[in-house]
Amino acid sequence: MVERARRLGRWFLALDSLLVILGFFVVMPMISLRFVDQLGWAAGVVGLALGLRQLTQQGLGILGGSLADKFGARPLIVGGMLLRAAGFASLAYAQSGLELILSCVISGLGGCLFDPPRAALVIKFTRPRQRGRYISLLMMLESAGAVVGALLGSWLLNFDFEYVCLLGAGLFVCAALCNLLILPAYKLSVRPTPIRAGLGQVLADKAFCRLVLILSGYYALWVQVMLIFPILVKQMAGTTTAVGWMYTLETAISLALLYPLARYGERHFKLESRLMAGVLLMTTGIGLVAFANTLPAVFMLLACFYLGIVIAEPARETLMTKLAQPGARGSYMGFSRLGLALGGMTGYVGGGALHDYAMLQGQPWLPWLVLGTVGVTTLLLLVNCFHREPSLARVNI
């Protein structure tokens, strides 16, 4: 692929990511506020719906990646985005737990189709040495989109949840049209790969599979910014606008620190060291919320948590792209989402159930201490994994 095509591809992916992240954050943080805070549903039910979306999207990601290896990126991306739009639109009319779950699963099915090929296009459009920096820039752009989306969603929620869902759906329709009209019919792998062969190649890579499964603990922490963090902030502040402040804080940290920290980390630290340092900060931030009694204290700990994500996520994504084999890129990037599937499902369902139990027992600190324990366990498993599998460290060379 000539350099001009790579450069244009990177620009297109950046703009596409902005539309996708706007559509996602307009809707997703508002679901727990709408159904738990406004309608009084059990957080466990809402957590189950969100967890099933996560499990569907990421758990079937390897299938979406394998299909993309065989048929190319564009049909999977366009179809997946339209399916996500349908799921978001149907959320507006969900009147029962079953309807909420169905809407979330439809949304997740869309994501399992478009997410792996988009991740594989990052590999196609970047050279190895520039990949980490490009991923960091994408994350900065996505952070800005997240805060704009969350602010729009929280503002529209004051009027009608239907407006929230239809705006999110409309943004995904726009993204689908852009991909249909602009994105060339790229193949993702160096050669067309049969679905079974791609899956087999990934599953034979035991070190990669082990790392992906361990990272489910990282994601169990990460998804709380969609579930119990918004509930806590809304309860302490007394206004849904405060949820937008959460994402403003995340964006400020990302824009100020993500790229310089990624560049500094590339020069001075290995990928696994950066990943583990980020998990440590996330664990500290989420665990100490158990002892925070004021909104400023919660936001200070959120800042620590977000800083951990800023350090860990570029390293994690770069590590996954470097471990992906050229003959099955889509399959590798699809399987890499399995940790998010398992961790997201566990985090959503467990976080929601813990929140309900803690409120009933008058123990609001309980979910945060349990999540802190999950973070410590994940960190110890990562240390052991990188020690046992030196092949995972050699990708830094």
UniProtKB/Swiss-Prot annotation:
Transmembrane segments: 11-31, 32-52, 71-91, 94-114, 137-157, 163-183, 211-231, 242-262, 291-311, 340-360, 366-386
Subcellular location(s) per record: Cell inner membrane
Family matches, as InterPro entries: MFS (IPR011701), MFS_dom (IPR020846), MFS_trans_sf (IPR036259), MFS_Transporters (IPR050171), Multidrug-R_MdtH (IPR022855)
Cellular component GO terms, alphabetical: plasma membrane
PROSITE patterns recorded: MFS
Keyword Cell inner membrane: yes
Primary localization class, coarse: membrane
Membrane topology: Multi-pass membrane protein
Pfam families: MFS_1
Similarity-based family: Belongs to the major facilitator superfamily. DHA1 family. MdtH (TC 2.A.1.2.21) subfamily.
GO terms for MF: transmembrane transporter activity
Annotated keywords: Cell inner membrane, Cell membrane, Membrane, Transmembrane, Transmembrane helix, Transport
Name by which UniProt lists this protein: Multidrug resistance protein MdtH
